[in-house]
Amino acid sequence: MTATQIPSAPSAVIEASPFQIFLDTVVVRGGLDSDYDARDIAEVVFRTMRDVMPTELSNRIANELASQSAPLSELWRDTNALVRWLSQIRPVLEIRDEVFVRRIQQEAGVPLNVNAADVMAAVFSATKQVLSAESATEIARHLPGQIRMEWNRA
């Protein structure tokens, strides 16, 4: 039997998980090189978002994300146990637009060839794809001015 006579195995269609779709969206729209960068940056964007919203809202968002993807909910809550705990007890922070973006640039290790505001917008877009419109609107209410505009545009 020659190679042309060997029947090919049926190709399995593997559907990407919501978490993988989220990461892929951040990679493509943010101009990143890897899922690892997307994951690390998204975690810092989420951390900064949580800092400007009440704990109750943050917990509701985590629960909504958990219904879509446990890994995405885990990322929202924070993979760092100490930071996750602090997010539950600290008051809402007042963060200006430039500080919001600077935190992402500095804390997330955004690659030098990537604009922090662009990758933030990519995380916003990917997040809004999995959230209800009601939750997206509620988040917007707590974001500072220019950041809110970016969230609404995403």
Residue ranges and their predicted role:
Residues T2-A154:
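General marker for long, soluble alpha-helical cores
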